Amino acid sequence: MAVITGASSGIGLECVLMLLNQGYKVYALSRHATLCVALNHALCECVDIDVSDSNALKEVFLNISAKEDHCDVLINSAGYGVFGSVEDTPIEEVKKQFSVNFFALCEVVQLCLPLLKNKPYSKIFNLSSIAGRVSMLFLGHYSASKHALEAYSDALRLELKPFNVQVCLIEPGPVKSNWEKTAFENDERKDSVYALEVNAAKSFYSGVYQKALNAKEVAQKIVFLSMSHKIKARYLIGLKTQLLLALYQILPSSWYDSLFRLVVLGRKRDA
């Protein structure tokens, strides 16, 4: 049995479909799960839920626990991005970003762990990002939420080792999905000192997403790992992603910062 959040689109949806094809019973959690025609399957139970709603989450897992005695795989795929400068992004948007990307995930894990502990070598896959290793220009709050997820997952892995529950971080680069549409829907204030650079960065990132990874590629990796006996702590997906991390680790911070700004903005900031 598998539990998947963010199940009605992108990587989450692809994981659901692939695990159903492998004969898994899947609990597909998403805000619009029951509206997703692709999830109409005898082995799939769709649950419409905002994962940041704590009371609703508790009720969902009470219902799951009443029907199931174990969970083989938990895939935390729910999440979104907030784009804009650190200074100008409203703090309520920042709180919402962390509520969905981090705190909701923590609660899903807590609620699912009793079921996961009942199955030896069960697995938790937390969908992080290259932004969890390298902070992105004007994606500071999104990057921060993924950095938090990385630290949390490392601690969780250490704690769950005696119970044979494996914890794995999936760190893809840009993936074709609705993510960029949501992230880029808000414009920086026109009077912001960052407006020109934010717009330049948005154009760059939009171009990157035209050549992004396919969600199916990432899902195939996750599903393959879900059926493997032993897995690593993290998987960085995409050659460009691996190159970016290598540059970040090798170059002095000042060099890396200048190079990153030059690539994204096409110029250095005016003095």
From Swiss-Prot:
Domain of life of the native organism: Bacteria
Key word Oxidoreductase present: yes
Amino-acid positions noted as binding substrate in the UniProt annotation, renumbered to this chain: S129
Active-site residues (renumbered): Y142
Transmembrane helix found in the keyword field: no
List of residues binding NAD(+): 1-25
InterPro entries attached to this UniProt entry: NAD(P)-bd_dom_sf, Sc_DH/Rdtase_CS, SDR_fam
Enzyme Commission no: 1.-.-.-
PROSITE patterns, per the entry: ADH_SHORT
GO-annotated molecular function: oxidoreductase activity
Keyword terms, alphabetized: Oxidoreductase
Family: Belongs to the short-chain dehydrogenases/reductases (SDR) family.
PANTHER family xrefs: NADPH-DEPENDENT 1-ACYLDIHYDROXYACETONE PHOSPHATE REDUCTASE
Protein name: Probable short-chain type dehydrogenase/reductase VdlC
Species for this entry: Helicobacter pylori (strain J99 / ATCC 700824)
